């Protein structure tokens, strides 16, 4: 799958589109998830679908259906660049090891800093108890999974 990811990423180079994920699903479905700084439009999905159809045909990639879409409002965060990009946003993280009996934290992602051992350290500002704001420091190695967790109003717009 790593080769397919690299091939897809190379095919999208220069389009201003970030490749988030490539997934093989049941019944020959190949699901490609893309993102852009200002959000994915339907035209982006169409353009990527046409581009990848040609590339996959030339490279003999076996699939029956190609699905191109956005990661959605609760997109996963997987690497340092994504964490840096979404600093200031509300996220949910699940830690590999519990801190104060908790593994799951939701709060505002803070800018990265570098620790004494040159690891990138992020902060998560969260409400431990009512009106008790704390900051959890973590590295990417500490995280099992992370995703955006925006608060949406009843009209579906991010607040």
UniProtKB/Swiss-Prot annotation:
Q: Name one Pfam family in it.
A: RimP_N
Q: Does the keyword Cytoplasm apply?
A: yes
- Name the GO cellular-component terms: cytosol
Q: Name one GO biological process term.
A: ribosomal small subunit assembly
Name the domain of life this protein comes from.
Bacteria
What role is this protein assigned?
Required for maturation of 30S ribosomal subunits.
Recorded protein name is Ribosome maturation factor RimP
Organism the protein comes from: Bordetella avium (strain 197N)
């Amino acid at each position: 799958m790593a080769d397919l990811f690299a091939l897809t990423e190379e095919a999208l180079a220069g389009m201003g589109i970030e490749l988030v994920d490539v997934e093989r699903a049941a019944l020959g479905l190949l699901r490609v998830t893309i993102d852009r700084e200002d959000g994915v439009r339907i035209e982006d999905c169409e353009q990527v679908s046409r581009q990848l159809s040609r590339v996959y045909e030339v490279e003999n990639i076996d699939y029956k259906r190609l699905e191109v879409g956005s990661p959605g409002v609760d997109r996963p965060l997987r690497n340092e660049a994504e964490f840096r990009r979404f600093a200031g946003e509300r996220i949910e993280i699940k830690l590999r090891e519990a801190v104060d009996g908790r593994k799951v934290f939701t709060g505002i992602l803070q800018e990265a800093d570098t620790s004494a051992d040159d690891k990138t350290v992020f902060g998560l500002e969260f409400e431990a108890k009512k009106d008790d704001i704390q900051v959890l420091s973590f590295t990417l190695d500490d995280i099992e999974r992370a995703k955006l967790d925006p608060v949406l109003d009843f009209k579906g717009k991010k607040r």
